[in-house]
Amino acid sequence: MWTAVSDLGDAAMTLPLAVVCIAWLTRSTAGRRHAASWALMLAAGMALVGATKMLYAGCGVQIRPIHFRVISGHTMLASAVWPMVCVLALSGGVQPRASSPRSLPLGVGLALGALIGVARVFDDAHTPSEVVAGWLVGSAVALAFMWRHGTPRVDARYRALVAGSLLAVSAAAYGRHAPIQAAIELYSPFLCGRFAFQP
């Protein structure tokens, strides 16, 4: 059960969804500039996750008292991407109240990100501190975008197409696994050795 939930946060699923979200953001009230802004914020979150993974895998850096090794990538991506998926799919053509990010679709996306984090803990993939860190980083990406740019809206004529495209990508990508972790474990020792970094 928990593995099935955890798969919703795999990069093989969330990154294709993010690409579709960016495409629809360019056609929404947000526009291309704001779509690029969300993409950069997501990339920054991913870079932070990647940095902790490389430091741990290659250099052994960790915070032992709180059992923290790396930021959970599944949880971070899920908490950043699923809120945008839900907002675009469920809020199309609906005028937000004073551009407030406090909406049911946004809450559903954040809750799903938290659930995926819980699944990672039960799967023994991460500790609670790693999942909390992932949720905070991912949620910060989602909420910061909404606070700064408001809730994006797609023309009501495209609402079914938005939901359909996101559903199709989800169905095609679900259950697949990106080889990112394997690449990190392979190259991190080389990078740490190259820069002579010692834990």
Predicted regions and their residues:
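Hydrophobic alpha-helical bundle signature of multipass membrane enzymes
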Residues: 1-70, 75-118, 143, 151, ...
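Interfacial helix-loop-helix junctions of multi-pass membrane proteins
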Residues: 53-70, 114-142, 180-195
